[in-house]
UniProtKB/Swiss-Prot annotation:
Pathway: Lipid metabolism; mycolic acid biosynthesis. Its EC number is 6.2.1.20. It comes from Mycobacterium marinum (strain ATCC BAA-535 / M). ATP binds at residues 186-191, 341, 345, 468, 482. GO terms for biological process: fatty acid biosynthetic process. This is Long-chain-fatty-acid--AMP ligase FadD32. Involved in the biosynthesis of mycolic acids. Catalyzes the activation of long-chain fatty acids as acyl-adenylates (acyl-AMP), which are then transferred to the phosphopantetheine arm of the polyketide synthase Pks13 for further chain extension. Can use dodecanoate (C12) and tetradecanoate (C14).
Length: 629
């Protein structure tokens, strides 16, 4: 039976007053109280995992208990930081904060590797009055905050120790469309993280936009391993609260160690009639294709029920999608299952995805024209052909336009500009950063083109600047790259993903997806570059021209291969393909290149570590993506 969405009328999302996810969960507790809400697959003690379940009635009771306790000890407007391991208690903590009417801040257990500096920075920024954690993690959390002054030290509450009986004192919080529900901290790798203020209107709006794009139906089941502190992981797991059916999750580490766990959970279960949906960044598809295919001695899989897996959070590789489909087509996976998508924290999460009945769209455009900010389609075998993956169509009741930032004017299809967004899923600003909020969230589109993509949006509406380059081509949205990551050498634009792809395709010695391309002023290059005759550059203290640097992690089993042939292959491929000289090729060991908390290559952090020498010496501190047990 098709999912009837009473909140979408004539292409517009309309909610009753004071709507929030709390009311949705309470509805399911009343009408489906004895049905499964969430299942956590715990692989920390058993290789095959232990199922830890919670019913809708139990979930409601635990949420009300934690919400009531927070109402007793905190004030409206207080920030509630969630420093839990990824399990059922994390979800109860997040919803408990929503039930209390306070502002949730989804973070992570301080025991997670690679995140300590980020966690301190976020706590400094949001100044929570209370931290929610578990009994097992409470001691570690208290040690983590011990360095803070007594006045700044938040209260620590173990949610699993809150008696369910406390739920009887809970009061339904008052919330309007401008009330902040939670702060979603961005995954930036060089600046102090910014907390996007997501309201009680933004959150259900974006959840509905995702469900509408996935054509959610009665009986559909969600599956995820993504971290809850990341926007894609959080919104994906919250889909169940609106759809009202079960959702299964595991930790990121459980997936990374054995990606077949994710694949097996996506497969049809006995007696199931609905489909499954999920979301993952691009690397996960390659990882699953390489290591997640069932062994001959394992039970058979039926993946014909997989409706859609949103592929987002990092650039989408056509090769990775092909490998994934080829690996799992024998098990019934449909070619339409993988959905290249676009989203960002400032939009709560979701902006666009590939329509359900379409396979991923891959076109080829001319590289020279692309670097001139134009999309010109060419044959796949053309000399300058560059593959571009469509991010699909924009969600219901949301608008995306391509803008010339100098004039704030909409650009016609085929021209590349900054992507601006409008809709009720867009956050209202960055926590405590008024100037930055105004620059990002409060922009006016000064002119529109005929057949504008802003059609239906108010003339005086506020638009959010994404910081991403993109264009429309043949009705689809394409993402060209981050504005701040653009490599400009000798006046020519180069997209870093394009350079990185050429580098990794030129040699088998690099890990796929672990290459960073960026530019550095010539006078900031290390002396080693000027001593290398292959670099073709002499030191001049006044030379500030930007020079290209490629950093790549060595693939497994290649650490003994000689450096020079690898560097020569990379230099030659980029010189031929892009007409630019690589001044330095730095090969580092696996795990060295900085990553953002969402798993993306941290190009700006990599550039900083390169300039200060810590990357070459091997003492940089990359963010570790795989967290949890």
């Amino acid at each position: 039976m098709a999912y009837h969405n009473p909140f979408i009328v004539n292409g517009k999302i309309r909610f009753p007053e004071n709507t929030n996810l709390v009311r949705h969960v309470e509805k399911w507790a009343r009408v489906r109280g004895d049905k499964l809400a969430y299942r956590f697959l715990d692989f920390s003690t058993e290789r095959d995992g232990v199922e830890r379940d919670i019913l809708w009635s139990e979930f409601s009771a635990r949420n009300r208990a934690v919400g009531a306790r927070l109402q007793q000890v905190t004030q409206p407007g207080d920030r509630i930081a969630i420093l839990c391991p990824q399990n059922l208690d994390y979800l109860i903590s997040f919803f408990g904060a929503l039930y209390s009417g306070r502002i949730a801040v989804p973070l992570f257990d301080p025991a997670e590797p690679g995140h300590v500096g980020r966690l301190h920075a976020v706590l400094d920024d949001c100044t929570p009055s209370t931290i929610l954690t578990t009994t097992d993690s409470a001691e570690g959390v208290r040690k983590f905050i011990r360095s803070r002054s007594a006045k700044e030290r938040p209260r620590v509450i173990a949610v699993d120790a809150v008696p369910t009986e406390v739920a009887s004192t809970w009061q339904q919080p008052e919330a309007n469309e401008l009330t902040t529900a939670y702060l979603q901290y961005t995954s930036g790798s060089t600046r102090v993280p910014s907390g996007v203020q997501i309201t009680h209107l933004n959150l259900p709006t974006n959840v509905l936009q995702v469900l509408n794009a996935l054509e959610g139906q009665e009986g559909d089941r969600g599956v995820s391993w993504l971290p809850f502190f990341h926007d894609m992981g959080l919104i994906t797991v919250l889909l169940a609260s609106v759809l009202g059916h079960s959702f299964t999750f595991m930790t990121p580490a459980a997936f990374v160690r054995r990606p077949g766990r994710w694949i097996r959970e996506l497969a049809r279960k006995p007696g199931e009639t609905g489909g499954t949906f999920s979301a993952a960044p691009n690397f996960a598809f390659e990882h699953a294709a390489m290591r997640g295919v069932p062994r001959d001695d394992e039970p058979p899989l039926d993946l014909s029920n997989v409706k859609g897996i949103l592929n987002g959070s990092e650039p989408v590789s056509p090769a990775s999608m092909r490998k994934f489909f080829k690996a799992f087509e024998p098990y019934g996976l449909r070619e339409t299952a993988v959905k290249p998508s676009y989203g960002l924290a400032e939009a709560t999460l979701f902006v666009s995805t590939t329509p359900m009945d379409e396979v991923p769209t891959v076109i080829h455009v001319d590289r020279d024209e692309l670097n001139k900010q134009r999309f010109v389609e060419v044959a796949a075998d053309a000399p300058n052909a560059v593959a571009q993956v469509s991010a699909g169509k924009v969600g219901v009741d949301e608008w995306a336009v391509i803008v010339d930032t100098e004039t704030a004017s909409e650009l016609p299809d085929g021209q590349i500009g900054e992507i601006w967004l409008h809709g009720n899923n867009l956050g209202i600003g960055y926590w405590g950063k008024e100037e930055e909020s105004a620059q990002t969230f409060r922009n006016i589109l000064k002119s529109r083109v005929p057949e504008s993509h802003a059609e239906g949006a108010p003339d005086d509406g506020l638009w959010v600047r994404t910081g991403d380059y993109g264009t429309y081509f043949k009705g689809h949205l394409y993402i060209a790259g981050r504005i701040k990551d653009l490599v400009i050498i000798d006046g020519r634009n180069h997209y870093p993903q394009d350079l990185e792809y050429t580098a990794q395709e030129s040699t088998k010695a690099l890990r796929v997806g672990y290459v960073a391309a960026f530019s550095v002023p010539a006078n900031q290059l290390p002396q080693k570059v000027f001593d290398d005759p292959h670099a073709g550059l002499s030191f001049d203290p006044e030379d500030t021209s930007e020079q290209l640097v490629i950093v790549g992690e060595r693939a497994a089993g290649t650490h003994k291969l000689e450096y020079q042939p690898i560097a020569d292959d990379i230099r030659a491929a980029i010189a031929v393909g892009h007409g630019v000289t690589v001044r330095d090729v730095l090969l580092v060991s696996a795990g060295t290149i900085p990553r953002t908390s969402s798993g993306k290559i941290g190009r700006r952090a990599c550039r900083t570590a390169y300039i200060d020498g810590s990357l070459r010496s091997g003492v940089s501190s990359p963010t570790v993506f795989a967290t949890g047990s």
